[in-house]
């Protein structure tokens, strides 16, 4: 390939890349939406497959697009920053991001407190309310939240709670309990089939698993929870201050 040909190819590639970026910025292709196939883009832009492939590969490397094996190439959802030291409910978190929140309950039941009695400081023969929800930010699934709430401390919480209500608001209004601190641990977890379905990700895709114990104004445990979120959808920020 001559120097002139290489220069011409680079111009075509840069033009196609920019046009794809412009289409994404203008909402032609929205977050989570599949872009046309390489063949379709070749026809649309009247360029070779090599040019299209390079433009797409660069946008994948930049985190603008994501390839799903066997499915195609999709517009990557914008990452959400989550400060690890923030103690707030999901509704407050959505407000801080300037985005609409929604939840879908996928499981709720009374279960034995035995696996959680030490963390919650409750008798092993008591019960907890298990609440599992998919949490959405601007209609995109952000994470799965599984919580276990001690019914010995918050009687009939499972009957008071209705889908869409804020659990932290219920704690405060019905039980005079304010969540003021929590302890979190983080590890990486491979997405199971049900998690992949709800989070719209690949089976085995890396997820952040954030395990949490929340405490009230009297330093008593309020609930334990596990959050599973796609590692490529969220940025975790640790803000340390020296006193």
From Swiss-Prot:
- State the Pfam families in the record: GntR (PF00392), UTRA (PF07702)
Q: Which residues bind DNA?
A: 38-57
Which pathway, metabolic or otherwise, does it act in?
Carbohydrate metabolism; fructoselysine degradation [regulation]
MF GO annotations: DNA binding; DNA-binding transcription factor activity
Question: What InterPro entries has UniProt attached to this entry?
Answer: Bact_HTH_transcr_reg (IPR050679), Chorismate_lyase_/UTRA_dom_sf (IPR028978), Tscrpt_reg_HTH_GntR (IPR000524), UTRA (IPR011663), WH-like_DNA-bd_sf (IPR036388), WH_DNA-bd_sf (IPR036390)
The answer to keyword Repressor applying to this record is yes
Q: Which residues form the HTH gntR-type domain?
A: 10-78
Keyword Repressor present in the record's keywords: the answer is yes
Induction notes from the record: Induced by fructoselysine. Makes part of the frl operon with FrlA, FrlB, FrlC and FrlD.
A Gene Ontology biological process noted in the UniProt record is: negative regulation of DNA-templated transcription
UniProt entry keywords in alphabetical sequence: DNA-binding, Repressor, Transcription, Transcription regulation
Described by its record, this protein's role is as follows: May regulate the transcription of the frlABCDR operon, involved in the utilization of fructoselysine and psicoselysine.
Q: Please name the PANTHER family in this protein's record.
A: MANNOSYL-D-GLYCERATE TRANSPORT/METABOLISM SYSTEM REPRESSOR MNGR-RELATED, MANNOSYL-D-GLYCERATE TRANSPORT_METABOLISM SYSTEM REPRESSOR MNGR-RELATED
What is the designated name of this protein?
Answer: Probable fructoselysine utilization operon transcriptional repressor
């Amino acid at each position: 390939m001559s120097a002139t040909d290489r220069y011409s190819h680079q111009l075509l590639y840069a033009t196609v890349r920019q046009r794809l970026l412009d289409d994404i910025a203008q909402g032609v292709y929205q977050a989570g939406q599949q872009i046309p196939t390489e063949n379709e883009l070749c026809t649309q832009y009247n360029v070779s497959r090599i040019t299209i492939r390079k433009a797409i590969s660069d946008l994948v490397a930049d985190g603008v697009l994501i390839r799903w094996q066997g499915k195609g190439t999709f517009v990557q959802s914008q990452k959400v920053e989550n400060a690890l030291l923030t103690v707030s409910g999901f509704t407050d978190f959505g407000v801080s991001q300037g985005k609409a929140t929604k939840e879908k309950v996928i499981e709720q039941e009374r279960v034995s407190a035995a696996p959680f009695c030490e963390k919650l400081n409750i008798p092993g023969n008591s019960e907890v309310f298990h609440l599992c929800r998919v949490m959405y930010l601007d209609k995109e699934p952000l994470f799965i939240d599984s919580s276990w709430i001690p019914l010995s401390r918050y009687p009939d919480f499972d009957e008071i709670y209705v889908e869409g209500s804020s659990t932290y608001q219920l704690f405060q209004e019905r039980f005079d309990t304010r969540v003021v601190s929590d302890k979190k641990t983080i590890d990486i977890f491979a997405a199971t089939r049900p998690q992949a379905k709800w989070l719209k990700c690949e089976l085995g895709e890396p997820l952040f698993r954030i395990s949490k114990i929340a405490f009230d104004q009297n330093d008593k445990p309020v609930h334990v929870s596990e959050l599973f979120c796609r590692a490529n959808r969220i940025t975790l920020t640790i803000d340390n201050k020296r006193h």
